């Protein structure tokens, strides 16, 4: 396993981690500058943040600073109430693939979606099997275009408590089953984004990580870190800083690297009650410290 104790060369910042600083939204161009000031070599930006600044401007700023990407957030949300909605989702994913390519991302992360309308407490239907079928079909269609463009897709399984509203793929095993079905040739164009927050609890985690690495090209395309706090006060927005919770981060990173992953450890922390209320400099400096000591 790589030794992170001496530097933060393999630290990436998911820009959600510092999108709020001292309780206020901060634009992406400022976040990029803050990362550059600290020698952080990679980020994973969100589409809305990129759009607010401008895709071409962000691409130029990243190039000027010599900052790369560890992923691009996000595509997905494939299920819909009707044919028009399904078509619109596919068109939006095409745009996301194009944006990821412009930014030279190594992959587009897919948060696949679930019961359409559930995020607004107005689910169009309750049939989760239908949602999973629409997800499978949406990934298959998007993969065709992704192959043409040369942009790998990374399915991110989410915690089961988000199965109704955000993602109906909830285990690494399920995500890998879809990869094996749609990319039987193991081309490297379809894999997974492994987020500690969502999968740390899974009794099959070590086995499935090893399975992901047993492909011609490892299925592990992105690795997201944070920690699980006890108690967790908000399921979405109370992630912990690495080392503040109960996850065996170093053990899991060992499994991930044994499976062939040699990329960035991407810090993704949603923390409305804590880190988003602190100055961005404090949060980024702590990310560096904990990357070296806890990840």
Name these PLM-found stretches.
Residues 12, 44, 71-73, 109, ...:
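Conserved beta-strand positions in the central sheet of alpha/beta enzyme cores
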Residues 3-6, 83-191, 201, 287:
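Active-site acidic/histidine proton-transfer and metal-coordination neighborhood
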